Amino acid sequence: MAFALKAILRPVGLILALGVVFTTQAFAQPVTQPFTFNISSHDLPAIHHGSANWGDFDADGDLDLLLSGSHGEEISTNLFLNRGHNGEQHRFDALTGPFHQVLYSASSFADVDGDGDLDVLVTGSTSRDWPYTASTRLYRLQSGGPVEYLEGHGIPDMHSTAMAWGDLDQDGDIDLVMVGVTSDDVPTTVVAYNNGNGTFDSHTDVLTGIGYGDVAIGDIDGDLDLDMVLSGASDNGFLTQILRNDGGSFSAISGSFPPVAFSSVDLGDYDGDGDLDLVVSGGEVSELIFEGSLQIWDNIGGSFTPSSHSMNGILAGDVTWGDYDHDGDLDLLVYGAEAAIGRRSARLFRNDADDGFVAASLLVGGVFADAEFGDFDGDGDLDLITTGSSSLGPSMTNIYENYRQVIPELPGAPSALVASVSDREATLSWQAPVGTDGLILTTYNVRVGTQPGGSDIVSAMADPQSGRRFITGPGNASVGEAVMLSDLQDGTYYWSVQSVNNAFLASEFAVEGSFTVKGSLSVDIDAEDTLPRRFAVYGNYPNPFTSQTTVRYDLPEAASVQFRVYSLLGQEVHSATLGTQPPGEHQVQWDGRSNGGSQLGSGIYFYEIRAGGSSASGTMTLVR
């Protein structure tokens, strides 16, 4: 039976009705540990029906703020530059620019053109009342110049949106998935592939159309491509889907996922087992008209099982992971309305491995709300911004400063970078930093460029020298220790990777590696003669070397490949399993470090490459 989406879900219907009947107090329960956050004084506009995003737009070392939504009788979109504390108040200066004013909005920072700085995408309605006028605009920061509106970007106009970024087609640049509603009240899911020049190739007919919901992107099944989670209202009812990426096409995996709308989803490895778990919260029809629900799903080998953790659900708000207490694992913020006629709440749940999630701090609740963690004051811990409507007023913007006394150290950099190249594909892998055995409490952030230190192929949205990131959240490679790139052009590429802990603090980048793509070796009748006829390993280059050397080798047929390094005494000091590789020319790099990540001393080392039943070896000289 068709679902009457237009009748009950447009903002002048259910949304405004909800806004009238939310009358209970924003908070009432006691906390279970000393209060962690204090509200910071500021002069930012109070916002509801909008979004808040942290990002170092001007690359000066602190997080700026992008706000959009309803501000009193006004509609507002502004970028505020972080100027630090000014007496008793934190100062933000509004950036004069071409931003269009929207509500029922979503916005985000992303480096869409690979130039190393942050661009801005803003979607929403330019009109407060129905029929809504949907609008989507993309803005680019010109180097040393003003903010520029990019016309012809190719992303559809939508409102009541949510968005997520990631390299869906593995070509290096960042693509977009967006859910929302068009001006014609059609729920729509957009998959927009980045053309690399500020324009996108958008598809609206490949996935179920979703509105009034949320989307998240991540490698759920560990196969080195990005999958997605969709949740919200479709023309056929509420739904939540997990979609696996199979070579660019997406298929739903089985599971009894909750059918919710006005929903929020987030991916994160809360149990530290090396895969992405899922939290889903949103509204479902009940005796209370519309009631919030929440479920955490454990990822077990790419399949999802509901966890035993229990907490009140929310709708028209946000659930988000972040390590606010600096113990290494992911905690959870649950922020929104518990029911259509019910309390607005904002709870921080502390992740205690033995005791599950413990309600730790209670903040000012809200609805039509957004929230984001970020270290806006630069003291090394996660602060928090929330927006929405509360019982204290129709609009609010609260910034909470985290006053935890224990500040974590920056994570260590990854080591043992290896690039495996075949045809026009490259698999880049690394080893976790020293001291991260056991629970996996880091994600990884990769950069790839055509010049040393560059990021024009894969943008890390971070400073290549210090490693300081321009955005908050997990790294672009998530919890995996490898990424794959395809359709690479001939040439030499330079790459590195950094660790990102669950408080979103990043290490320096690892010692830079490089690899070379030398044209296609695809097998067909006319091209078979270009494939190697025998297994061969060539001398490393450079030799002697100080920081990194490359060993090239040929495979006449597909084989499982291993790379090992031995000292003069025959002790294995480094090993890497490169997986099954196709026939063709390949290379592997070594940075002079042990498996544990420590630098080895100067001297002569033996290397060996094994491929199936074949092996070959050589010597290399490391000079420190």
Model-derived features: positions:
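Recognizes extended acidic, P/S/T-rich segments that occur
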Residues: 441-488
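Blade-edge motifs of beta-propeller repeat domains
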Residues: 27-47, 81-102, 139-158, 193-210, ...
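Residue-level detector of functionally pivotal "anchor" positions at catalytic/ligand-binding pockets or at interdomain
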Residues: 403-416, 514-540, 556, 615, ...
